Amino acid sequence: MEMLTEASIQYVNKQVESGIDCFQLFETYCGIIPEKMYTEIVLPYSKKILNAAMDKNCKTIFFPKNYNMGLKNINQDICDITSIDWQIPIESARTLLNDNVGIQGNMDPRIFFSDKKEIERYLVNLTSFGEKNTDWIFNLGHGFIPGIDVNNVN
């Protein structure tokens, strides 16, 4: 883990030198190990990588996919914004996260398999969260799924 972390920090440093304004770390497989194990063993390395960007005054976004209840372990010492997947209600994620950490995502990418009316209802419901939470960045809770109707995205 040390070697991967050091290589990642070198990557972060080069990205910052190249002029990025924000660095996002994806922990796509975060949820496949128990929360306690991830928090104790892996999160310190993620924090180190994110802190490398923060130390250079670069904003940070952390995406710990499926971390769910573990979101309570994320604070402003780890990242500026936490990106969340769609498998936890956004209100629950906001409650678990430290108030000083912004929130991004939560849109279920499977919604694009629905018809336009269903998509519209879903978006009205989701964006109402943003009306009450100005630190929320609208985004998918993960990437687009192959096979979606691109017209539904428009």
Tell where the protein language model's regions lie, with residue ranges.
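Active-site loop segments of alpha/beta catalytic cores
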Residues: 1-154
